[in-house]
Amino acid sequence: MSNNQTLFERAQRTIPGGVNSPVRAFRSVGGTPRFVARAQGAYFWDADGKRYIDYIGSWGPMIVGHVHPDVLAAVQHVLADGFSFGAPTEAEIEIAEEICKLVPSIEQVRMVSSGTEATMSALRLARGFTGRSRIVKFEGCYHGHADSLLVKAGSGLLTFGNPTSAGVPADVAKHTTVLEYNNVAALEEAFAAFGGEIAAVIVEPVAGNMNLVRGTPEFLNALRALTAKHGAVLIFDEVMCGFRVALGGAQQHYGITPDLTCLGKVIGGGMPAAAFGGRGDIMSHLAPLGGVYQAGTLSGNPVAVAAGLATLRLIQAPGFHDALADKTRRLADSLAAEARAAGVPFSADAIGGMFGLYFTEQVPASFADVTKSDIERFNRFFHLMLDAGVYFAPSAYEAGFVSSAHDDATLDATLDAARRAFAALRA
């Protein structure tokens, strides 16, 4: 029995399903999860000592690779001064200033510890600001595991075939309206029917939790126009795509200004950190200034802030995002070319440092399109690549991530493995 198998069996005795986040269990793809022993750059090593090229990067945060020396030094520097204080620090101000500088739509920002906290708090704030209850989200978009957002959500729920979680009260779900992603007509109909009831529309401008699906400019511009017309708050959930699609996030890429933005992953540099922020007149409704309560013992944790601040400074290097986008596009286009050469139905897309792999002929534009993917063939591909030392997301419903640490050698090795995998899929 391998060390991975031994650890998984041991974990299942004390941890539900043996994991602390469902997608890690390999339930969709089958087999034994890889237990990570260490990581460096674009690689990690499992409990059996096998090395993998990592295209998950902790589900997005590791944009500069694992254990970047500058991030490591920043964390080591603050550790001797204390791990957590429950009181303000200068570093909190520094990271807030950095976020506001990089994302101009954010005039004020509040730090939290997870993406779920960020989206949950942003929605509460939008409801408090507008005095309305209804929220609008989109099918297949995942915004964390708050009750009102686990209605036709994406990510891990799709992996397990359950679009809506058990345990979500009907009285909570009734305030959530779910529309089709990229469907402008459905959006216009919803606002015509009950626009005056809508507190907020929350959207992933680049969805990464039903695999990678881009918002169309027409769709996102319609969102901005309709929310402004009806007095609803437009919330961009950029927990995944923030600082990764572009330095200023998807809102910079599309040239659209939301009212509130949720951030995470990259801003923690691998540590538990997230944030939400936006217009000052909305943010002023948060306690202690206003009546919308939000708090957190570990919000603005000094160790997490140090890692995040170091990462944000690294990604401002000239040409960083151009280089990241180029290598991610090369990966996606080359994988698609290898599949075509092998006669395997397949498509791929990339934007910034995110990519999507689909066992369909066309790149999807909605949740319905994503569900047409050949899941069985994806699962076979996943294991062929895993055996070759390439670690893609263990689900057909997750985006992948490239870091600045991925170089030509890692991309070449990935494509060599993919060539063999696609040939095996054709056989």
From Swiss-Prot:
Compartment annotation: Cytoplasm
GO biological process, one term: protoporphyrinogen IX biosynthetic process
GO MF, one annotated term: pyridoxal phosphate binding
Cofactors named for this entry: pyridoxal 5'-phosphate
Main location: cytoplasm
Keyword terms, alphabetized: Cytoplasm, Isomerase, Porphyrin biosynthesis, Pyridoxal phosphate
N6-(pyridoxal phosphate)lysine, modified sites: K265
Reaction(s) the record says it catalyses: (S)-4-amino-5-oxopentanoate = 5-aminolevulinate
EC numbers: 5.4.3.8
One term under GO cellular component: cytoplasm
Gene3D superfamilies per the UniProt record, alphabetical: Aspartate Aminotransferase, domain 1 (3.90.1150.10), Type I PLP-dependent aspartate aminotransferase-like (Major domain) (3.40.640.10)
Top enzyme class: isomerase
Keyword Cytoplasm tagged: yes
Pathway membership, UniProt: Porphyrin-containing compound metabolism; protoporphyrin-IX biosynthesis; 5-aminolevulinate from L-glutamyl-tRNA(Glu): step 2/2
Protein family (similarity comment): Belongs to the class-III pyridoxal-phosphate-dependent aminotransferase family. HemL subfamily.
Oligomeric and partner information: Homodimer.
HAMAP family linked to this entry: HemL_aminotrans_3 (MF_00375)
Family annotation (NCBIfam families): hemL, PRK00062.1
Protein name: Glutamate-1-semialdehyde 2,1-aminomutase
Organism: Burkholderia pseudomallei (strain 668)
